[in-house]
Amino acid sequence: LKGLARIDLLQRVEPIGGKGGRKALWHIKDNLFRFWYRFIGPRRAMIERGMGDMAVPAIEQGLPLFMGPVFETMCRDWLWRECAAGSLDFPMTDVGCWWGNDPKERSQAEIDIVAVDGSTTTLVGECKWRGEPTDVDQLRKLDARAWLAGAGAQTPRWLFSKSAYTDACKAFALNLPSARLVAFEEMVR
């Protein structure tokens, strides 16, 4: 694995604030390779025999799930861009994701975006790449899990979405002073 990391094909990822060890995961770093191994490789014989159009429905069906991690990376990159432009209301020296045990729920939990300044959590975020508007449940879940990544009550909670937000989500965000809804359209301006 380390050899593949040296040539930039794989990336070792740890939860932000992690000390290394058993929680680290390995990911294919290049999205072109991820796409190939997820969609093209399993259908290669079909495609090589001129039946590529028969592979399209399976690719279209799997694309939203494939795009989830891609969108998370886009959101983290956007935060770095905003940080460089001086547009953030909080300091940030690193940004990543967090995963681990949720002792309240007795299950595994993940937070897509965690920004830190040294050892202080300065932002938590959730990223949703879906075709329908993002619902209030996603913001509630983020708010409930924020403490797992060291966030306090005033730590910003940002919900990133490819699509719009439901009215219930917008209303909840208005009543949660630390919340911000970031649409994909805003990120690509």
Tell me what each language-model feature is.
Residues 15-16, 20, 24-189:
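A cross-kingdom feature that marks ATP-driven nucleic-acid transaction machinery
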Residues 5-17:
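A short, conserved structural fragment
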Residues 1-3:
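Amphipathic alpha-helical scaffolds
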